[in-house]
Amino acid sequence: MKALRNYLDKIKPNFEEGGKFHAFRSVFDGFETFLFVPNATSKSGTHIHDSIDSKRIMSMVVIALVPALLFGMYNVGYQHFHATGAAGGFWEMFIYGFLAVLPKIIVSYVVGLGIEFVVAQWKKEEIQEGFLVSGILIPMIVPVDCPLWILAVATAFSVIFAKEVFGGTGMNVFNVALITRAFLFFAYPTKMSGDAVWVSGDSIFGLGQSVDGLTVATPLGAAATSGAVPEFSWDMVTGLIPGSIGETSVIAIALGAILLLWTGIASWKTMFSVFVGGAFMAWVFNAIGPDTPMAQMPWYEHLVLGGFCFGAVFMATDPVTSARTETGKYIFGFLIGAMAIIIRVLNPGCPEGMMLAILLMNIFAPLIDYCVVQGNISRREKRAIKSNN
């Protein structure tokens, strides 16, 4: 790393004022601060000194996503070999999944970072780090058969209209990755739902077997269409079920959650409240809900199926788009969990529910914080008046 530091110091004058690459200073600054903590000194103002900056925080989130991503790659291969009947061992399945998922990661980063580079150059600012996380989240929350060109269009839409128009990193109202999924869901519904998108039917570089018209339903999709409550299986916990690339394994997601909670990056209040809200609403529907598979599904199945765990750990805890007051985090998380189950039960056309629940609560997060703050002010005023009397 010292050699790299010396090399960057050597070429840095070329990117400063008067240098021959001055036009690309924002690109150089973004790359430099990604690798090393900035050594710039503030001229005025009060600042908090810490050994970690936002890029380091984003890097920790990406590390927390790695277990779910790696398992997702394996599961993509496992589901393909299992559905097509092709012969293959662990490494064949993992390599197949790796080759299927890698292009989506590349497209996500190339399109998203490309737009951020252009915006940074236009605004003459340093490249912002927020897409470091969004770029890996996007391919993890889509089906494996999502076409690359559609993913590119959706990524561009979300970066421009859900992030840059609001001012960039830290200013967005909605979770960028979920806006990508929402755009895909409403603009290209056949590529995001049904039984033909969750398992790849193609052979990749000789691995696997090509099968036309391969259809495999997710447990939630089967419950919404078959009229039967899916029987609980440990595959629902380990993640060996059809679904979006990175959302199926509760164990892998839990490993990421432990890291986020241990480092203090994610709020346990928000995360815990999402599960409480989901379990409570599932229990309510079990008790008084309609006689449908979604309404009668046990609360623990609701929590481990679909994107519930992934959304609770990596989406609801987004510090930019979630509630920021301590009490507000409980309310915000609880309402997300409850709303996700309500959408699942009452809207057969959307058996997932988590995406819409989080985006809806992103809208209400500022209002929740406002009500909490005003409530605290009101209580303190009453205590002050009472003590003066």
Located regions from the model:
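Hydrophobic, membrane-inserted alpha-helices
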Residues: 111-116, 131-140, 155-162, 252-260, ...
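A beta-strand-loop signature enriched in Asp, Gly, Thr, and Trp
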Residues: 271-326
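C-terminal ends of transmembrane helices
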Residues: 42-48, 112-123, 160-170, 255-263, ...
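Structural signature of hydrophobic alpha-helical transmembrane segments
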Residues: 94-108, 145-154, 236-250, 295-308
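Long hydrophobic alpha-helical segments that form multi-pass transmembrane helix bundles
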Residues: 170-254
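Loop-to-transmembrane alpha-helix initiation sites
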Residues: 173-178, 300-306, 329, 348-361
